[in-house]
């Protein structure tokens, strides 16, 4: 509604928007002052203009007196909105409804990069699983291409807290083994379709953390998103200085020879 749009801008300097996917409707507001801060727009000398193009918003910076375009600030799509919100830009996107329900991804494949960066491994060079997914899968929306729907999600493994009870245990943590262990943990629990090796014996591994003598440890997704496979669903929570333990995230718990997914039902799934 155009009247509501300009009313929200004039009163609260926010841009009210809506994303609809299938039967899920999500409304939110873009805080334009935060947007200006994020993209270094001096609101005393410039103003923000925006234009809609299908499902895209084009933000521009204009000179106040002449109204001349200085630059295109950002071309924002629903994917970008979800990604930024997922990575913690809470002050930029406010009053977001049904976010967890909307920010769901069907997970096809899990992999790690040991000798090169993930972008080079997946995009720059031909990657067997990525090519198979593009060849075999169908789109959810008949009006889009599969390349428009595929998302590459990159995660950094961050060890948060290690409590040493027995001083005879070496408290150093090998990062390569940690990454390898995390990959196997998620594959064994989520059973993603294009991972041929399922690691059914996990946590027993030769290159993971099994032999590091930990009493127990766990993995959580530190982002506000949900990963879905044919077998199960796992939901994350935003990691921040105010939410160090990702309280609302599901947990992959490893103790001894056992591994299980502990679901947190406090949030929307």
Regions found by a protein language model. Name each.
Residues 1-269:
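Boundary/linker segments flanking structured domains
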